[in-house]
Amino acid sequence: MLSTLACVARYLSGKEPGSGFWRVERESNGSEKIAIWDASLGPMPTQVEIDAAALPAVKAYRIPFNRAECSRRIFERYPAGRQLSALAGLYDSANVATMTDWIAACIAAENTAADAIEAATTVQAVEAVTVAWPV
């Protein structure tokens, strides 16, 4: 998961981590700084710009991150072929119900987390949101 400053750099630059356009490094005291900011992105963001972008940047990162994790969990447990077979009626209703209930629970857990992230008013509140994935 990206740090807050990395989320901000991604948000402000429109470039993904590892693209070579920017890099966040941890200093010896544990704080982070933007170590590389490509000139094609414009001037390096000021601390005021970083602070202003922190909340929307973290929200813009965490919601899709959780959605991707939801999809990963669903397809890991129930690959597309198995889901299609269930849809085609090749599994008994008890197995289909178990599968659809679990998938629905995953989606509901992710949606609950997304709602909490959207409602958050601080970066700390966003970072405190966890997804209660079904087992």
What name fits each language-model region?
Residues 1-135:
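A preference for well-ordered globular domain cores
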